[in-house]
C-alpha cells in the first residue's frame, strides 16, 4: 500500500491561549489517532518542532481519497481545531518502515 506524508496545521477553532493537549476535544482526538496507529493507517506522526501548531503524519493508505475520508473523521478535523495543509505521495528509497 502506498505511503503519504500529510502536513496538518491549526484550524480556525484552535485556541491560541491553550497548549496542544489543552485544546477542546484533545482526548477524543488522541483516542482517534491512537486507533489509526493501531490499525497501521498512521505509521508515524507528531508535531513539527520548529513550525508552531503544525504536525506531520506518515500514512499507509490505498489512495488520497481514502486518506482524506479517514482523516475527516478525526474529531479535531470535524470541529475545525485542525486542518490538512498538504498531502504528498511518498516513496521510501532509503531504509524501511517495519
Please give the residue ranges for each predicted region.
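Conserved, structured core segments of small domains
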Residues: 1-98
Amino acid at each position: 500500500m502506498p505511503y503519504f506524508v500529510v502536513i496538518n496545521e491549526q484550524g480556525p477553532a484552535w485556541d491560541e491561549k491553550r497548549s496542544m493537549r489543552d485544546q477542546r476535544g484533545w482526548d477524543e482526538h488522541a483516542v482517534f489517532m491512537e486507533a489509526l496507529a493501531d490499525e497501521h493507517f498512521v505509521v508515524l506522526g507528531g508535531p513539527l518542532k520548529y513550525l508552531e501548531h503544525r504536525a506531520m503524519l506518515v500514512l499507509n493508505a490505498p489512495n488520497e481519497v481514502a486518506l482524506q475520508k479517514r482523516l475527516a473523521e478525526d474529531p479535531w478535523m470535524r470541529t475545525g481545531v485542525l486542518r490538512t495543509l498538504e498531502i504528498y505521495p511518498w516513496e521510501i528509497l532509503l531504509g524501511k518502515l517495519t
